[in-house]
Amino acid sequence: MTSTLPYLTSPPATHPSNSDHKKLRSACDSCHQCKVKCSGGSPCFRCTSKGLNCRYGYQNRAGKPKGSKNRKTLEREHQLRMEWLTSQLRDANGGLGNLNIDLSDPTTLLPSPFFQSTRWKQGHMLPQSSVQPTPANQCIKSTEHESECLPTPQGLDTWTMDLGPIAQTPRESTSESLEAFTTPISFTGGGETYLRQLSDPTTPISFGFPSPHARLDGTGDPCACVQTQAVNISTLHQLTCRDRSDRFDLAMKSITSTLETCEKFVVCEACDKSVASILLTLSAIELIFTLFEQLTMNNRRLSPPEEEQRLIPCSLGDYKVTKEESQAIRNVLVKMTLSKGKQALNALQNLVNGSVDFLDESGPCEASQHDSNNANEPMLSGLSVTDRNYMTQCISRKNAALEVLMAAVAV
């Protein structure tokens, strides 16, 4: 016996096409839209009681496809991948950190198996018959004794090809504090002893870098001016690479030490006044001006509360200096340091323009190299016209910037 109630009858059977495999919803469209439970049937109880049109639509699966990953899963996989990469780079940097690199010996830059004689000369060389007579090959033929040891790009080991990611990673500092690295070395006390340790190849802190263009004294060490300036440049790099210079004392100490080294370099008779040594001094002055700009900007703007807590306390005996007085003292110190910088620039300008002929034993080689590159360019006092003009322009630009900085500091 079939029931006469319309809501107890089953919905008509539908035969969807085999192409889409869609199924009907268990709730009618009206109940689905109102988000209420549907009794089923055609029509359902709710549509019958309210006189609605009861229709059943196909299911609409709008979710992600099967096998897709959500954001949390992707972030977790990325984090695991980055942790693995970091561990690999840390192991690689730890292995490379204990190496004693000597630039004068190119074999130290590649692993020892890479320089096996049979493998180097037989396995990694192109046959001479395959070399085309191009202009580049003609240049290579002029230095056959050097090109015989050069490998082909296809023959390079995986070790040498994978150095790119390691070289591009930022250098991790051993300490977040600026006090961890060496402060500038003065010319008093044990500065020269420490500098001799820096140049000693037997010590673990030395990498055996050759120092050309530096005049050696009786013990075989370069002049203390050049060595101290190199240490100052390393310290200035540490200070200028930070986001902001929050240590006024370290900045002033580095600037003062570098300016004193510049003045001693100009008047020192043992120093070699070559192009390389003068460019080293100009590089130090370039880094000094970066600190000058930071100090000038910090003096002109108001310090936020978190920076005021890091200010170094200042006192004169039992008298404690206030914040305004401490700022005035800073301005005076910056102004005096800018004046010292102007004196150092003037002394360096006089050295470039009116220096005598400072040429060491390597001078004839440098002069012949200049003559081969610029045959018609005269050499004046050990410096070419191009070198002298370039240095003069650099010093002039720094003098102009110095005038602006001195006008910006109010005393």
Curated annotation (Swiss-Prot):
Predominant cellular place of this UniProt entry's protein: nucleus
Q: What induces it?
A: The expression of the hexadehydro-astechrome cluster is induced by glucose. Expression is positively regulated by the global regulator for secondary metabolite gene expression laeA and is strongly induced in conidia during neutrophil exposure.
Q: Name one Pfam family in it.
A: Zn_clus
DNA-binding region(s), chain positions: 28-54
What is this protein for, i.e. what is its function?
Transcription factor; part of the gene cluster that mediates the biosynthesis of hexadehydro-astechrome (HAS), a tryptophan-derived iron(III)-complex that acts as a virulence factor in infected mice. Positively regulates the expression of the HAS biosynthetic genes.
Any one GO BP annotation for this protein = positive regulation of transcription by RNA polymerase II
Against CDD domains, the record matches this protein to: GAL4
PROSITE patterns tied to this protein: ZN2_CY6_FUNGAL_1 (PS00463), ZN2_CY6_FUNGAL_2 (PS50048)
Q: Which domain of life is it from?
A: Eukaryota
Its protein name is: C6 finger domain transcription factor hasA
- GO terms assigned for molecular function: DNA-binding transcription factor activity, RNA polymerase II-specific; sequence-specific DNA binding; zinc ion binding
Q: Which cysteines are joined by disulfide bonds?
A: none
Give positions of region: Disordered: 1-21
Compartment list: Nucleus
Gene coding for it: hasA
Q: Where is the composition biased (Polar residues)?
A: 1-17
Which InterPro entries does the entry mention? Answer: Stress_Response_Reg, Zn2-C6_fun-type_DNA-bd_sf, Zn2Cys6_DnaBD
Looking at the UniProt record for this protein, which Gene Ontology cellular component terms does it annotate, in alphabetical order?
nucleus
Alphabetically sorted, this entry's keywords are: DNA-binding, Metal-binding, Nucleus, Transcription, Transcription regulation, Virulence
